[in-house]
């Protein structure tokens, strides 16, 4: 079951970017803010100066897929905005690099569940 909905409104992005905490790695930045919902809210933002539209869309698809791989391990109730650094060449983006960086950032932000909590869902304990 999908636990995440997308941020769509401009004011939703602004509140996360202004009130949230920032965690950076080489290629991506993640802003995290608590919300009062049982779901995570995800927003992906890439500036128009980062390549052409098809390159930005490809990067968004890669980021979305990386997020869905890590979604079951995340604690619920957060608004998350993911940005790609301006200086990074968007053509060189790879799935493995982004997944690794997202995992590191989520660990630093303490958003990952403990392994016991993850397995309880599958074992019905």
Predicted feature locations:
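Positively charged, solvent-exposed patches that mediate nucleic-acid binding
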Residues: 1-125
């Amino acid at each position: 079951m999908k636990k995440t909905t997308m941020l769509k409104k401009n004011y939703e992005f602004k509140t996360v970017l202004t009130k949230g905490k920032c965690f950076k790695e080489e290629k991506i930045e993640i802003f995290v803010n608590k919300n009062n919902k049982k779901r995570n809210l995800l927003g992906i933002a890439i500036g128009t100066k980062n390549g052409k539209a098809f390159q930005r869309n490809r990067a968004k698809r890669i980021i979305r897929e990386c997020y869905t791989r890590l979604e079951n391990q995340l604690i619920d109730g957060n608004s998350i905005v993911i940005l790609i650094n301006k200086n990074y060449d968007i053509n060189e983006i790879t799935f493995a690099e982004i997944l690794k960086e997202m995992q590191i950032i989520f660990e630093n932000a303490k958003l990952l569940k403990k392994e016991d909590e993850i397995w309880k869902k599958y074992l019905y304990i």
